[in-house]
Amino acid sequence: MKTLLLTLVVVTIVCLDLGYTRRCFITPDVRSERCPPGQEVCYTKTWCDGFCSSRGKRVDLGCAATCPTPKKKGIDIICCSKDNCNTFPKWP
């Protein structure tokens, strides 16, 4: 009986853990959402466009399987792997 109970507890823990997905902030709404399966990294990408001097840097928040790499100079990407760790940056 104890073996059966222990087996049920282990199976329950394994099943609950397999269903977990990361939560990250997502733009454009800056809402916390569950990431698709396999995407366990949250990222914050910032860059300047033509309005950078008046509006500040553009911001993109999202989920990824691995930390994205910048394709151009001037793009900053910060990655993290905790729920909702990619908050909108605070500007001075």
Swiss-Prot record:
GO terms for cellular component: extracellular region. Gene3D superfamilies: CD59. This is Long neurotoxin 2. Binds with high affinity to muscular (alpha-1/CHRNA1) and neuronal (alpha-7/CHRNA7) nicotinic acetylcholine receptor (nAChR) and inhibits acetylcholine from binding to the receptor, thereby impairing neuromuscular and neuronal transmission. Residues 1-21 form the signal peptide. PROSITE patterns: SNAKE_TOXIN. It comes from Oxyuranus microlepidotus. Keywords: Acetylcholine receptor inhibiting toxin, Disulfide bond, Ion channel impairing toxin, Neurotoxin, Postsynaptic neurotoxin, Secreted, Signal, Toxin. The keyword Glycoprotein does not apply. Coiled coil: none annotated. Belongs to the three-finger toxin family. Long-chain subfamily. Type II alpha-neurotoxin sub-subfamily. SUPFAM superfamilies: Snake toxin-like. The lineage of its organism: Eukaryota, Metazoa, Chordata, Craniata, Vertebrata. Disulfide bonds join 24-42, 35-63, 48-52, 67-79, 80-85. Pfam families: Toxin_cobra-type (PF21947). It is found in: Secreted. Expressed by the venom gland.
